[in-house]
Regions:
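Transmembrane alpha-helical segments in integral membrane proteins
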Residues: 1-4, 72-90, 175-185, 256-272, ...
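TerminUS-proximal long segments
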Residues: 252-259, 265-371
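Long, contiguous internal "core" modules enriched in hydrophobic/ aromatic residues
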Residues: 49-251, 354-362, 367-370
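Interfacial and helix-entry/exit segments of alpha-helical transmembrane bundles
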Residues: 15-22, 190-213, 273-284, 347-349
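C-terminal TM-helix exit segments that contain a strictly Trp-centered aromatic cap at the helix terminus
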Residues: 28-39, 215-222, 285-295
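Functional transmembrane-helix hotspots
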Residues: 35-52
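Membrane helical hairpin/interfacial module
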Residues: 1-39
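Non-cytosolic membrane-interface motifs at loop->transmembrane helix junctions
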Residues: 12-13, 153-164, 303-310
Length: 371
């Protein structure tokens, strides 16, 4: 949205970026857990060691995940932090005590709001936005390679990279709506996060939802058209009509059919309906991953067939990520500006009276002592 100069992003970008970082933190836990020995989690990193020429296996998708998650987290964190610098300065100047003033002063990096500060800030922010855009595509493509490079029916498919990228944008906007609706309702921010913002996000969700739905159709069609009996049996006898078939139909309903009501303006302008639809979409995206994995519970040998039922530890570990995500989210709402103060000032009518440079100089003189 920043690259396309969409001004309406201002009210939602801060919460969306925070959500991304917190979600990546939760996601980074799972490769460690799946290793079985998390205390050896540093082994996939290319670190100097005493074993001579021992290096990670760069052919392993697990190592690709390490680089994808760490790169995504690093760039997202820097992008989020750079956007916060002017707001840290605003909070610093209004801090109620010396300790908070010192903490926010360190975080604001000596920001004074001069024209040179603004010039360097906007240049850095634009460069990071440009870097983040292809990074989103590459990261989710690499995640899809975890499945696509495996020579297994149902996984070895070229549709997976665009399918995962569209799904990431789809579920991302659904999650932003799930956060924006309670925030605007309980924090009294309906003047900042307006019905127009929800309407625009719903339209993007509808467009990406159609892409994901198309991916489901291509996946089913290619399983039939390829004349590969293993692909066909996996799709028809396992996913659709197998023991987990009801999850597949629930997935089609949640991700494909339910969002079609977003074609109607009345639905897009109803925040309660949008919240429910977004929640259903997020459930559907979880079911998508579940169906991808659980469809392999019937191997090539019938002796290896079995039914999966989650244990207490499976459920509690998964619910723990919800707790971690919500804890970080509430801390964010408590100690940081949920909406970009600096960018909101640019949208005020009086900010367009002068030129861009003059508006910064006017802001500096109005706040006295900013140089």
């Amino acid at each position: 949205l920043n690259q396309f100069d969409k001004k309406w992003r201002t009210s939602i970008n801060r919460a969306a970026e925070a959500m991304t970082i917190f979600a990546v933190i939760c996601a980074a836990m799972w490769p460690l857990i799946h290793m079985g020995r998390p205390w050896l989690g540093y082994w996939p990193l290319p670190l100097p060691n005493t074993f001579g020429s021992l290096w990670p296996n760069f052919h392993s998708p697990l190592l690709w995940d390490v680089f994808a998650i760490s790169t995504y987290f690093s760039v997202s964190l820097v992008f989020w932090y750079v956007g916060l610098v002017p707001d840290f300065a605003s909070v610093r100047d209004r801090a109620p005590n010396q300790l908070l003033r010192m903490i926010y002063g360190i975080l604001s990096l000596g920001w004074r709001g001069g024209s040179m500060h603004w010039h360097r800030y906007e240049t850095a922010y634009l460069m990071l936005a440009g870097l983040s855009t292809p990074l989103v595509l590459s990261v989710h493509t690499i995640i899809s390679f975890d499945f696509a490079v495996a020579n297994l029916p149902g996984w070895h498919a070229t549709i997976f990279p665009p399918y995962f990228v569209a799904g990431a944008v789809y579920s991302g906007f659904a999650m932003v709506i799930n956060l924006a609706v309670p925030i605007r309702h309980f924090y009294g921010m309906k003047d900042f996060i307006t019905d127009k913002h929800l309407d625009n996000m719903a339209k993007i969700m509808l467009a990406t939802g159609l892409m994901v739905f198309y991916g489901y159709g291509v996946e089913a069609f290619m399983a039939y058209y390829s004349a590969n009996e293993f692909e066909r049996d996996l799709m028809m006898k396992n996913r659709v009509f197998g023991p987990y078939g009801y999850f597949y139909f629930a997935l089609i309903f949640c991700n494909g059919l339910m969002p079609q009501v977003l074609w109607f303006q009345r639905v897009r302008s109803n925040e309660a309906a949008l919240f429910v639809i977004s929640l259903v979409v997020n459930v559907g995206m979880w079911l998508e991953r579940f169906v991808i994995l659980m469809s392999l519970q019937r191997d090539f040998m019938p002796s290896a067939w079995g039914q999966y039922s989650p244990t207490f530890w499976d459920v509690s570990t998964y619910l723990g990520t919800f707790g971690l995500f919500l804890s970080l989210l509430f801390l964010f709402c408590r100690v940081l500006p949920m909406i970009s103060i600096a960018e909101m000032k640019h949208l005020l009518p009086e900010s367009h009276v002068h030129s861009h440079k003059d508006s910064h100089d006017h802001s500096d003189s109005a706040h006295g002592g900013s140089h």
